[in-house]
Regions:
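A metal-dependent hydrolase signature that marks the N-terminal structural subdomain at the beginning
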Residues: 1-150, 317-334
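Pan-zinc metallopeptidase signature
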Residues: 1-37, 230, 239-334
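Hydrophobic (often cysteine-bearing) scaffold residues that line and stabilize catalytic clefts
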Residues: 149, 153, 157, 267, ...
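Post-HEXXH active-site segment of zinc metalloproteases
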Residues: 150, 154, 166-219, 290-301
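Catalytic glutamate of the conserved HExxH
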Residues: 155-168, 277
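Short amphipathic alpha-helical segments and their helix-coil junctions
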Residues: 199-263
């Protein structure tokens, strides 16, 4: 369970009687910060709708090898964090440096709604990062904007993964695997960032769809697809990614490794792919999910077999905490 980090006089819990807007920096100043058993600093404010057991389970999913890189971050779970609002002069032209500076200074502070309302929900965003000074950052996550535990967990894990990769970088063993897959023309990717930077690395337009290579026969070919039953978030059972066999689409044309490669975009691609893999790995530890739930319109999903290979590398680098388990199981769909 989480322990309180004592910073001065004990603070009494805040009772929220009606929805109101509060400066995020003020929340960070006034709200008690706690620490999960694996070292994640966090706090809650307002009517989050989160049960303590569910929150603890989500926080404690993060392996201690990853939380060591999160010391500068405190995760604030709030009902709604509002989108950035700028003063009227924020549209000053970029060629006017003085006006642009004034525009930036005129930015309103990050505001948080203490409870859910339709009006505040329309103005909310999934999360806001707030610099708190002295190298500290507050990540304010909108718990009431997420449709379910899956969405909230993934939002949290995405933020954790980005912060971790910013500090730790991309391991060579993962970079080698992901780049080999990209050179081999593996289908799809794990995020729009990974999809676009991978295309740009090979000199293609960011939204390019590579042509498939013809194959002589597709009979008896198989393709792994993640599928799992979703269960109660607070369950103590270890989460497992279940993989089924279905017919494979045609593979994409492999890339000539001697062709011109944009090294900057390649580095950005590998960073995005690793961050995505860490987030999906954490999600698989927290709860069961169907791989199709990660599907987006802007790009095709990475082939499940390729994703499984990436996740295994992440699991070897950052083993699960006690009470959590990572596994990939295969089954043939009838």
């Amino acid at each position: 369970m989480a322990d309180t980090v004592q910073t001065g006089q004990p603070r009494t819990p805040q009772l929220v009687r009606a929805a109101s807007l509060v400066n995020a920096a003020q929340i960070a100043h006034d709200t008690e910060v706690r620490q999960s058993s694996n070292g994640v600093s966090f706090a809650t404010f307002g009517e989050t709708g989160l049960a303590d057991l569910d929150l603890d389970r989500m926080l404690e999913t993060v392996p201690t090898a990853i939380t060591a890189a999160l010391k500068a971050n405190t995760y604030y779970f709030v009902p709604l964090a509002l989108r950035e609002a700028m003063a009227e002069n924020s549209e000053a032209g970029a060629d006017n440096a003085e006006a642009l500076l004034k525009s930036e200074l005129a930015a309103e502070p990050t505001m948080v709604a203490s409870a859910y309302t339709d009006e505040f929900s329309d103005a909310a965003i999934c999360h806001r990062n707030v610099e708190l000074g002295h190298g500290r950052r507050g990540v304010f996550i909108s718990t009431r904007l997420m449709g379910d535990r899956f969405a909230l967990s993934f939002e949290f894990f995405i933020n954790v993964a980005h912060a971790f990769v910013d500090q730790a970088g991309t391991p060579e063993v993962f970079a080698d695997l992901a780049w080999k897959q990209a050179l081999g023309g593996v289908r799809g990717e794990t995020s729009i960032d990974a999809w676009e930077t991978r295309n740009l690395a090979f000199g293609r337009p960011p939204n390019a769809q590579p042509e498939p290579t013809p194959v002589a026969s597709r009979r008896n070919r198989g393709f792994a697809s993640f599928s799992a039953r979703q269960r109660a978030f607070a369950s103590d059972d270890a989460a497992t990614a279940v993989v089924g066999q279905v017919n494979a689409p045609s593979p994409l044309a492999p890339i000539d490794p001697q062709s011109s490669i944009n090294d900057k975009e390649r580095a950005l691609y590998l960073e995005a792919a690793f961050s995505d893999a860490v987030a999906i790995y954490l999600l698989s530890l927290a709860l069961d999910f169907d791989y199709s739930e990660l599907r987006e319109r802007e790009y095709p999903l990475l082939s499940p077999a390729a994703l499984a290979a990436r996740l295994r590398v992440v699991a070897e680098l950052y083993p699960p905490n006690p009470g959590y388990e990572f596994a990939v199981k295969y089954r043939r769909r009838a």
